[in-house]
Amino acid sequence: MTMLTREEKMNELGLAGEKIVTNMLNRLQPGLMIEHSINKYDSEKDMLVDGKKVEVKTESPYVFKNCFSFRPNQLRKCRSVDVLYIVSVPHIKFKHFSDGWVYRLIPEEYKTIEYVTKFGVRMIGIPIKQDAVIPVYKMSEEEIAECMKYSNTEYK
């Protein structure tokens, strides 16, 4: 098997998260019209669900701050969709209460923090313990294992 680059792993992880969310929605709400964006660089959404813009982020939590995080250039997209889902991939080294959960976030309500990584990178964090971050689905062991194949977590 060919070794994937960091970018390829991130892409595969994102695709796995989108499939998990699609399957979850189909199970929990049969009959939804789900249309995936054809353009992988779509700056507005990952998919439309019954005409609503949906973004999916697939990542391990920043365990020491109990938050999900992304670069500041993603904030506009994460705030402008109708629904944001975060697929929480277990951290390679540290257990966390969010491991294996899919969270539904209310874009206009979730609070954020800013921080700088030990590598000097500015990041936006979404604290997990707030009313606008709602656990909606516990992934199966198979789904978690698929995500873990592509996990690329830096020490956080």
Task: For every predicted segment, state its role.
Residues 1-53, 57-156:
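Nucleic-acid endonuclease domains
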